[in-house]
Amino acid sequence: MTNTDKVQNVCGLKREDFQTRINGKETDLYILRNKDGNEVAITNYGGALVAIMVPDKHGNLANVIQGHDNIQDVVNSPEPYLSTLVGRYGNRIAKGKFQLHGKEYSLPINNGPNSLHGGKKGFNAKVWDALQMNDTTLVLNYVSAYGEEGFSGELKTTVIYTFTDDNELVIDYMAKTNKKTVINLTSHGFFSLAGIANPTPSIENLECEINADFYIPIDEVSIPTGEIRFVKGTPFDFRTPKTIGQDIDADHEQIKNGAGYDHCFVLNKREEGELSFAARIMEPVTGRTMEVYTTEPGVQLYTDNWADGYKGQHGASFPRRSGICFEAQHFPDSPNRPYFPSVVLNPGEQYKQKTIYKFGTIA
């Protein structure tokens, strides 16, 4: 039994609108609810977030995550990664090729000349096995077969969503393989702290802080150049809070290459793998805030630079730059960059990462 069976959901989503069978597996809607009645709604198709209901500074609840209100629209979304889980490899791998243990692997090309977010049918397009443990915890499991989307090894993946009484959405990722492989899991949440609407307001007035002294520059097809650059004196310096819109259209090579921000920031860490502060945004009209904490070495800032005007939950529309993504992850194209933190997973090892999105308000 899920929370959708017990009480009226403040998110307004209906369980039956998410129930169908895809490739022989059942999809459903799961509601996590904390002591204050705030909610997170998730479908097991792609592990997609379809509602995050949190209050503004006046206590008014609104949905701050972009998504869809039925399974057909989730499956057929013009933005296939709209607030979904991403794997096996989040972000880009140059030309869809990499070498591992002396063997070259070829992945589907689905983003210009590159492979993006695990290929043509990544974890965003899979039906996960779901078990709701209690009011606040959902466990998702997926077994990625050997050779799926060109990757080596069978990969057994578990993702646990927890919504705490402190309005923290905690995402724990775990995975094991039976053969050496590469892995880079993340969540592609499109956040709209003003609340989704028709149209959903621009993110350009969000005040943003990112705990990073360095970022990874990209070429014209969004592959890392190989450098790691200091943010000082560039549009990528968010060490002191500034609005997203201040430099999003700056006359800067890197902004042009990303059509805005679509870059990985190298997070400041005292030690590898520590859970630490990554980023914070504040929406000035509603007073809503979101802080990001992660064990990952990087966070991809994406400012919704391409898709424009498609429809979401309850008649909402999502113009270009109405959502913002903080994708906690290892760096893009790491399998081809031995000097980047390793993304190799060996048999007998366990991949683990934790990311927290903490929602709050300021007066």
Language model segments and positions:
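An exposed, glycine/acidic-rich loop-and-rim segment of catalytic or binding clefts
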Residues: T2-A363
